[in-house]
C-alpha cells in the first residue's frame, strides 16, 4: 500500500510538472488543436485548444508502473499481470494517437474511419486475449458472484468488453474534466477491490494512473488548457475493462462505469430512434436534445427543456452519479 502511495505521488508530480511544457510546445509549434463541430455554442471558444494530453499521463503512468514494479515485485506472475494490463493500455493508446495524429497533423477531420478504428481495436483486443488472458486459463465471467463459463466464447466477451468500454470513455470525454475525474472515481473503486483481494500488483497500476490523471486534471478542468484526446480516452477505457477482468469482477464495470454506459446508450438510442422515426414518419425525431448525454444536460438539464447547465454543473452531476454507483458496488460486495 505504501509503495502504491509513493508511486501515485511520483506520477502526479511528474504529470503536473510535464504538462505545461507539452502545452507550450503545442502552442510554440502552432500545431492545430481541438476542432469544434458541435451545436453547443459555448464550446466554440475551445477551438484550437491543445489536445493529445493523454500522451503525457499515459507515458508517465506506464513508466512509473514499470520502474516501481521491476525494482520491487519479484513474483513473475504479478509482473505478467502488470505487463498484460499495461500492454492493452499502450496498444489502445497507440490507436488513439494515430487517430489524433491524422486529425491534427494531417488535417483529416475524421481521423481513422470507423472501420479502421474498429479493426485496430479488435486486433489489439485479440493480442491482449491470446498473450495475457488465454494463458491464464480464464474462460468464465463473474455475474454477481456466480461464475458463468463461456468456454471459447469468452474471447468474444473480452473483445466486446475492451472495445466497448474504450469507445464509451471516448464518448464521455466531451467536456472539460468529465472523463478524467470519472475515470479517477472508477479507478479508486477498483483500487479498493484490489486491496481487499490482496492484488497489490493491480493496485500499483491503479495508483500510478490515478496520480498521473490528477496531474493532468490540473490543466483539464474548466477552462481546459489541454484535452486528453483519443490517445487518452481509448486507453483509459481499455484499462478499466482489463482491470475488471484481472480482478474477476467484470459485472461491476456496468455499475462503476454507469456514466460511460449512459453516454454510450444515449448515442445508440438517439441514432436508432432517429432512423426508426424517419422511416415511419418521413422525418427523424430525437429523444435527447443532443448526444452524448452530457450535451443533453448542457442544453436543458435532465428534462432537456429546462435551464442550460454549465459544464461544472454537468461535471458535478455525472461525477456524483459515478460516485454513488461505485459506493453501491462496494456495498454489494462487502456489506450486504
Swiss-Prot record:
Q: What class of enzyme is it?
A: transferase
**Keywords on this record?**
Cell cycle, Cell division, Cell membrane, Cell shape, Cell wall biogenesis/degradation, Magnesium, Membrane, Metal-binding, Peptidoglycan synthesis, Transferase, Transmembrane, Transmembrane helix
Q: Name the reaction it catalyses.
A: UDP-N-acetyl-alpha-D-muramoyl-L-alanyl-gamma-D-glutamyl-L-lysyl-D-alanyl-D-alanine + di-trans,octa-cis-undecaprenyl phosphate = Mur2Ac(oyl-L-Ala-gamma-D-Glu-L-Lys-D-Ala-D-Ala)-di-trans,octa-cis-undecaprenyl diphosphate + UMP
**What are its GO cellular component terms?**
plasma membrane
Q: Which GO terms describe its biological process?
A: cell division; cell wall organization; peptidoglycan biosynthetic process; regulation of cell shape
Recorded GO molecular functions are:
metal ion binding; phospho-N-acetylmuramoyl-pentapeptide-transferase activity
Q: What is this protein called?
A: Phospho-N-acetylmuramoyl-pentapeptide-transferase
Question: Per the UniProt entry, what species is this protein from, by scientific name?
Answer: Streptococcus pyogenes serotype M6 (strain ATCC BAA-946 / MGAS10394)
